[in-house]
Each structure stands twice: as C-alpha cells, then as structure tokens.
Amino acid sequence: MTQPAIAEGVLAWTPARGPAPAAGSAGQLLVADSWLLREGRVRGFDRHRERFLGACAECGGGSPRRLVAFWQDMTAALPRTGAWFPRVELAAGTLELRLLLRHAPPLGSAVRVWATGQPDPRTVPRRKGPDLDTLAGVRGRAAGEGADEAVLVGPSGVVREGATSSLLWWEDDTLCLPPPRLPVLPGVTTGLIQDRARRSGIRIAHRERTVDELEGREVWLVNALHGIRPVTEWTGRPMKAAPAVRAAEWRTWLDELMEPLPGD
C-alpha cells in the first residue's frame, strides 16, 4: 500500500469523513488503547480491537456498527512505514473517537524498577484510558528514584502490575502472575505469553506476592510497546534482580508475532 508522508498528530473520526485533523482538544479519556506499529506490522492487533471496542461499548460509545466503522477507517489511516506508537481513544462528553499518531519512542530490552511498591491510584483499573495521566505521575516519581517503572500494590502490599506494564515472574519452572480477581488490566501481551506457555506445557500459576517476595526471581514487565522487559535492577532499596535466563528467547518469539495490518 502506498501512502503519502504521515505526520504526528490527532485525527478525529466521523462516519461521513473518516479520520481528519482534530479541531480542538478532546474531553477526558473514557477508553484508550495503543500498540507498537513497525513497518506496517503489529502483534495481537485483533486482541487490541476486541479490548478497545468492548470497552467502548461498555461506556456507551456508540453502536457496534459505528465502532467497527471507526476501527476500519483507523486501520486504513495507519502508517505502513516507520516505527509508530498509535493510540485510539474514546473521549467523554462528546463520545468522540480519535486516533493519535505518534512516533515510537526508543524501545527497551530491560527495565529498572522502583522497589518501593506504590499504592494503586487508579479509579478504573480494568479499563485503559481514564487513569493514564495519574499513572504518568507515578512513572515520573519512579524516574526521580532512578527507575523506569513502578509497581502498583494493593492495601496489603500484594503486587498488581506496573504503572504501564503487566507483571509476570518465574518461580522455578512456573510462570506466575497476579490472580485475575485482583483489579488489573487485561494485558494483550500477557495473553499472548500465557497462550504460548500453555502450548509449550509450561505451568502457569496465579499467586499473591509482595515486592519483597520478588527478590531473586526473574521478573518481567510486559506491554505492547516494549514487549518483554526483564527487571535487571531494583532501585531505592537493597533488592537483587535475578539473571534474566529466559527473557531473550521469549523476546525473539514475541518479535516474530508481528504481522501485517489487516488488508495489506
């Protein structure tokens, strides 16, 4: 597919004209979703579609026909060259659907994590969008401690996830993650990893752990942008990170899941 040069910016969508440069700012985000787009290829695109359209429907974001039409037009408008980190949005008030085009930031292969668990400040933890600004503040505080990410914890200190990432770890040969009854975002990348583990016969367990109990374990923070990032350093407290003996092979597998956008 040949496209003209595409610049960063916000495109507001209407059924009549499709995505077009937005005239003003949107209201508070009700729903958002984002993914890595590299040379027109993405992983788990159907899962992002399902999560975003389902969340929009729950928020009264329009009929299924309207939401599907937006997704189709949005997909056609995505760049087919370069590295991008697009975000789709549903705004409160007008229920406007938007596409935010932005270049992908530098990708990381490892992550430093603030070892002091942060109380989970989210108001809608199972839906991406409403709490993005609040979580950006948490990450900002982590950066002040020399870290890339922070771990959100519940009142009892049990870990939930990172500010912008899902949390997984290994206990011997068992892949572990927080129990689904906890208020965590259903991560697309986490779902892909769990599917591979099941196909490979790897045991998966949902366990409650504090940050302290992650010391000496191989811990991963995963999301749609960076993929799998093993924790190589805990900052702010004398915690040791385990060697990331599994991460490289799983990162290679995850990169190979990148597929062309539908219709290309």
Name each model feature, range by range.
Residues 1-76, 80, 91-264:
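Helix-start/capping segments and mature chain N-termini
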Residues 84:
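Non-catalytic DNA-binding core/recognition domains of DNA-processing enzymes
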